């Protein structure tokens, strides 16, 4: 078993029942007795690299679980999923904005989440709210601690003025009962909260993410630099046949116009997504107003890209590090989840000898890793010694509960590093030892190590290469480990 276990996209690998068991109900406001919680599904790895917050209206958070596999795919890709209901809200008023901020701030504190790694998603009316909230975050950045890096909305009305016109048409048409009932409810609710449209149009415009008839950039201008996606079921034939809705009786015209305005403003990250499959509810009924119009795997891949979440499958290193036959490899972003205190940012690229996990092998615990570090971190013997202690101490600590290691077998992690004669091509070279618990055999162990440093002026990166083995320096394994370094090259741009 390797040091880290990466889980890639697994759309059908985990049954929905498993997610119900792993989903946590989190109370964020003890004073609110009506709707004071959200659902949280941490990633399988426990390593939260990003957060997707899914909002819905007119239902409880639990409603989402059988309707979409977005939480499933996020679970397998180091993304924390938060699901929150916005009750019967149709737009983002001041109270709702404050409530969303309270939820997001609670998530940051509860899960130690990075505020720069949030994406918001909303379904139908909650989608309109997610868009407007994101706009406000960039219109008044000083008032919000979380600024969404991406936002997407599913089958959502983006223009409240046009939504009222839709209500008028549906009530007059009086064809499909569901639409007529919704139109009456929405019309009454918006009139009650914003006033009559004819005399309060400005209130509707201010509350909308977008106003189609505006002659100048409106609220949408604050999405100019934000990745935005709008998802719609564009099967107009079905709308005409079953509900007597033309193209103009859907949310599609306004949604597509919003995306077009963003594209014209220079936002190349704005996308209109036409569903590849017809919208279906979990009960098997055809309905364009469904979470299922989102391709969950593709959406999470998009989120990972926009949130800058490392993916080994698509990683294109700026260096060459060989992989001998039979050796294992793992790559992940720094700092690792088991040693968050490490002052490193960048990528760790690991090479495991074939016998790394075999206690009977001469290659037991023989491995090497490259730290491809951003900028210019402090590197000297003392810093390396402290950081290795944090790294291996955290690694052992993470394995204690997993392997059920009894307390009487634990030993302190002790590191000793010194600077030695600089090897050819190195900026500096170090060597030393790591005394620790071998969590596989559950016995004390001393790892010998050689550390090479090389700076890359072209890429403003630093390469730190660590070689490890419990064998003495005269053992043949060190020749193999050192060969990895001597063949290491930084690619030219």
Give the label of every model feature segment.
Residues 355-438:
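Conserved polar/disulfide-associated segments of primarily extracytoplasmic proteins
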């Amino acid at each position: 078993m390797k040091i880290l276990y990466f889980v890639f996209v697994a759309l059908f690998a985990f049954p929905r029942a498993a997610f119900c068991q792993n989903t946590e109900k989190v109370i964020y406001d003890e004073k609110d007795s009506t709707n004071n919680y959200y659902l949280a599904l941490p990633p399988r790895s426990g390593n939260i690299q990003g957060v997707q917050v899914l909002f819905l209206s007119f239902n409880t958070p639990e409603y989402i679980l059988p309707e979409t596999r977005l939480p499933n795919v996020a679970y397998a890709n180091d993304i924390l999923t938060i699901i929150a209901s916005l009750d019967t809200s149709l737009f983002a008023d001041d109270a709702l904005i404050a409530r969303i901020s309270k939820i997001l701030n609670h998530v940051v504190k509860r899960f130690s989440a990075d505020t720069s790694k949030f994406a918001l998603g909303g379904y139908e009316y909650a989608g309109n709210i997610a868009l407007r909230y994101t706009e406000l975050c960039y219109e008044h950045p000083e008032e919000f601690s979380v600024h969404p890096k991406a936002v997407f909305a599913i089958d959502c009305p983006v223009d409240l003025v046009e939504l009222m016109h839709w209500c008028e048409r549906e009530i007059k048409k009086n064809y499909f009962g569901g639409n007529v009932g919704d139109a009456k409810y929405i019309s009454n609710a918006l009139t009650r909260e914003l006033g009559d449209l004819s005399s309060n149009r400005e209130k509707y415009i201010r509350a909308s993410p977008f106003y189609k008839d505006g002659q100048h950039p409106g609220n949408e201008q604050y999405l100019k630099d934000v990745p935005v996606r709008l998802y719609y079921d564009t099967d107009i034939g079905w709308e005409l046949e079953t509900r007597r809705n033309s193209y103009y009786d859907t949310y599609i015209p306004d949604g597509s116009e919003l995306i077009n305005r963003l594209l014209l403003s220079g936002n190349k990250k704005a996308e209109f997504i036409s569903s590849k499959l017809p919208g279906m509810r979990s009960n098997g009924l055809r309905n364009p107003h469904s979470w299922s119009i989102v391709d969950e795997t593709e959406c999470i891949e998009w989120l990972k890209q926009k949130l800058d979440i490392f993916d080994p499958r698509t990683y294109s290193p700026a260096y060459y590090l060989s992989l001998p036959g039979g050796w294992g490899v793992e790559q992940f972003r720094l700092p690792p989840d088991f040693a968050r205190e490490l002052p490193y940012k960048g990528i760790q690229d690991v090479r495991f000898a074939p016998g790394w996990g075999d206690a009977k092998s001469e290659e037991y615990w023989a491995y090497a890793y490259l730290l491809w570090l951003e900028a210019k971190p402090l590197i000297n013997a003392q810093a390396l010694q402290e950081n290795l202690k944090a790294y291996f101490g955290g690694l052992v600590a993470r394995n204690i509960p997993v392997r059920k290691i009894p307390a009487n077998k634990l030993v302190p992690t002790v590191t000793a590093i010194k600077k030695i004669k600089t090897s050819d091509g190195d900026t500096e070279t170090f060597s030393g030892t790591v005394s620790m618990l071998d969590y596989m055999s559950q016995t004390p162990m001393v790892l010998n190590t050689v550390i090479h440093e090389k700076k890359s002026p072209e890429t403003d990166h630093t390469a730190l290469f660590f070689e490890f083995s419990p064998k003495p320096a005269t053992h043949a394994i060190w020749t193999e480990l050192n060969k990895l370094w001597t063949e290491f090259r930084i690619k030219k741009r």
